């Protein structure tokens, strides 16, 4: 790419090295810790789904039970694998019995770690294969229909009712939309559980649930066959359940997910240690599933002046890039965020915005940048 801005690449390299150091320092903490959300994600990746009689998701039931009665720092997988050896049951059956108070997986005789890993291996690999086959299915669609050259047109639906969202999404696809983003209901990022099943009520958006993902994915596949185009599906995994929603998206073949390393800290007041651990595991999953992440730099400019704080956008892009690389997410899957949020009366406003956009394009040449 020919540079149009005559950037000082020594400064670019210096900034990238600083961001890399930030990510490496944080990763020392991340590698030594888990969170309840990460443990619930492990439950989901071992096939646990559904709710108890009080509509509490079974992954929450299992993790909370171990927290209260055992030692969650050993990891939920160890308890589940051990229970499988003791009972001969699958993780889903174990979770259901824990929910009914018919089984206490914290009081069982411990088996050898190697045996526990062996017991878990088959089930873990089956769900990994499901994610791999979803990725292969996406690639198959793109091979048959081809992919769009140039920018994707990104359209948001947010009625609160997944079935009405489907109607709008199908109409948008027929009008040329390439990506359908289903905005989450207000406040879902602060729920410490993922709701279950199809939902028909929401406020400013629709609940992100695995069943809602499945319903929308099916509808977009059907209209895609009609239009001979692959329509991408986007949802949001920022907040308290980042890796859980990333796993659900991987299992239902979502194509894009909002995933910012710092968003929960800066804009949702979520514990920063938890956020950094959660974003890492969620990005590992996104990377493996071939999901393009969209980062949240547009949020900076909704809370600060776009000219005075323009540098914060670039700083965040650098940091998001480095956290993504540590998680194994390739540059081609980093939808680094930007937005046009200047006052319309700003002198030379469009020129300033174009320069900032071109700068992002030159500094992150492989990233599918997100402009809003």
Regions found by a protein language model. Give the residues of each.
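Long, compositionally biased, glycine/small-hydrophobic-enriched stretches that function as flexible linkers
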Residues: 1-163, 171-176, 181-215, 237-246, ...
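Alpha-helix-loop-beta-strand connector modules within alpha/beta enzyme cores
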Residues: 139-146, 194-233, 276-293, 316-326, ...
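Surface-exposed charge patches
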Residues: 170, 247, 358, 362
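Glycine-rich anion/phosphate-binding loop at the beta-strand->alpha-helix junction
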Residues: 252-255, 264-372
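Structural preference for beta-strand elements that scaffold enzyme active sites
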Residues: 150-158, 179-181, 226-234, 255-258, ...
């Amino acid at each position: 790419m020919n540079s149009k801005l005559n950037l000082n690449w020594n400064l670019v390299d210096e900034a990238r090295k600083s961001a890399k150091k930030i990510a490496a320092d944080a990763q020392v903490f991340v590698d030594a810790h888990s969170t309840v959300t990460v443990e619930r994600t492990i439950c989901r990746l071992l096939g646990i789904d559904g709710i108890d009689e009080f509509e509490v998701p079974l992954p929450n039931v299992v993790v909370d039970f171990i927290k209260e009665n055992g030692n969650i720092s050993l990891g939920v997988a160890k308890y589940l694998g051990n229970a499988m050896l003791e009972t001969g049951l699958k993780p889903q059956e174990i979770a259901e019995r824990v929910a009914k108070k018919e089984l206490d997986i914290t009081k069982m005789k411990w088996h050898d770690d190697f045996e526990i890993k062996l017991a878990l291996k088959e089930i873990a690999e089956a769900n990994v294969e499901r994610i791999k086959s979803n990725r292969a299915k996406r690639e198959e669609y793109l091979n048959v229909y081809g992919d769009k050259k140039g920018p994707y047109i990104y359209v948001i639906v947010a009625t609160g009712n997944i079935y009405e969202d489907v109607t709008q999404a199908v109409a948008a696809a027929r009008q040329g939309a390439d990506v359908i983003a289903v905005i989450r209901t207000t406040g879902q990022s602060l729920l410490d559980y993922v709701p279950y099943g199809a939902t028909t009520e929401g406020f400013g958006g629709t609940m992100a649930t695995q069943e809602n993902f499945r319903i929308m994915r099916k509808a977009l596949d059907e209209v895609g066959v009609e239009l001979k185009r692959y329509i991408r599906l986007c949802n949001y995994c920022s907040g308290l359940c980042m890796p859980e929603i990333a796993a659900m998206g991987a299992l239902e073949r979502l194509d894009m997910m909002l995933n910012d390393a710092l968003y929960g800290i800066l804009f949702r007041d979520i514990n920063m240690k938890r956020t950094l651990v959660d974003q890492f595991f969620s990005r590992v999953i996104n990377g493996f599933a071939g999901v393009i992440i969209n980062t949240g730099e547009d949020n900076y400019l909704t809370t600060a002046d776009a000219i005075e704080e323009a540098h914060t956008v670039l700083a965040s892009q650098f940091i998001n890039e480095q956290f993504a690389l540590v998680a194994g997410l390739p540059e081609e899957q980093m939808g680094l965020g930007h937005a046009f949020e200047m006052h319309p009366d700003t002198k030379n406003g469009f020129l300033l915005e174009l320069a900032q956009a071109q700068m992002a394009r030159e500094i992150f040449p492989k990233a599918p940048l997100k402009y809003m």
